[in-house]
Every structure is written in structure tokens, then in C-alpha cells.
Amino acid sequence: ANFVKLTGKESTEKLRKEAVEIISHGNNVLRETKNVTEKVHALMPIVENVEKLAVKKIESIYGIQFQREVQYVLNRHRYIFDAFAQKDEIFYIFECKYVRNAISRERLRSVLEQMLRYKQMFKDQGIATKFIVAFVLDEFTENRQHEIMDFYSSVAPEMTVYVFDFNKLKVEFSTKS
């Protein structure tokens, strides 16, 4: 297939964009560029750790190994995914979204629209896919979990969505150095 591992520079840029997305959807209005840059650089390692832990959790659920940070090239367009696996002619596409505080409907809708575009692209190519989205909450509550799950079950019941507690993932997959 056309799936290729991201280079170090591409991976760093992906993490930077995700950190900016998290900040822009947060409750704080950021005014100073220096402040934004500092926050982005502080968030990047957290986002990377969240993705690693979420991929481990998804691997344990599905019993297959995922390759992290891959791109799919189609007609000179690059599509970047947090993780990818293939089993029995089905492509598993995984996207992880880290949520520090509350999550807005706008962000939920944005993730949904992105996944639906990807789904249509693969369908047009005749490729069987399973899309998995995981929201990893820094401040996990059952109300937030239900809010996310209810949104997706009402508008995209065919999409597989998980909501994980970041602290529980850290405990479950902690490694002794």
C-alpha cells in the first residue's frame, strides 16, 4: 500500500500542529506569539506520549500491531495518520485526540468531518477500512465521556470511538526504566 512512516521532521511538524490545535480549542485566548510558542513546545512531548499510550491500548483491544505516524499518498496528496494497521485486507486507521480540559462541539465536528473525508477517499479507492478515533482526556469524567460518545453515536454510528482516561493509560502501560 501507499503507507509510509513519517520522517523525524514530518513527525515533529505533526506534533506541533496537534499542539496548536489543542491550544486553539482550549478555553484560553492566547495573545502573545511567544506565549503560544512556549505552550506549543511544552505540549508536544505530552501529545506524543498520549498517542503512544493510546496506540498501545488500541493494540491490546484489537490484538494487532499498529505502525505509528504514517502518511498515505494518493494523487500527490498526503494524508497523515496517527497509526495504521492491516489485517485480513482491512486497513485500520487510528486517530488520537488529546483533550486537556472541556471539549467543544466544534472540535468534535471537526474530527468527524476529517474522518468522513478519509473514509470517502478510501471508499472511492475500493479499500476496506475501519476508522478508530480515541479521545484521551486529561481531566476524565463520565459526563465528558458520555458527551463525546453520544455525539458520535448520533451522527456517525458506524465510526468506532473510544474515550480514555490519560491517567489510567499511564498506569496501565507504565514501563520501568
Regions found by a protein language model. Give the residues of each.
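A short, glycine/Asx- and small/polar-enriched loop/turn
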Residues: 77-80
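Catalytic cores of nucleic-acid endonucleases
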Residues: 91, 96-160
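Acidic-basic catalytic patches of nuclease active cores, encompassing PD-(D/E)XK
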Residues: 7-74
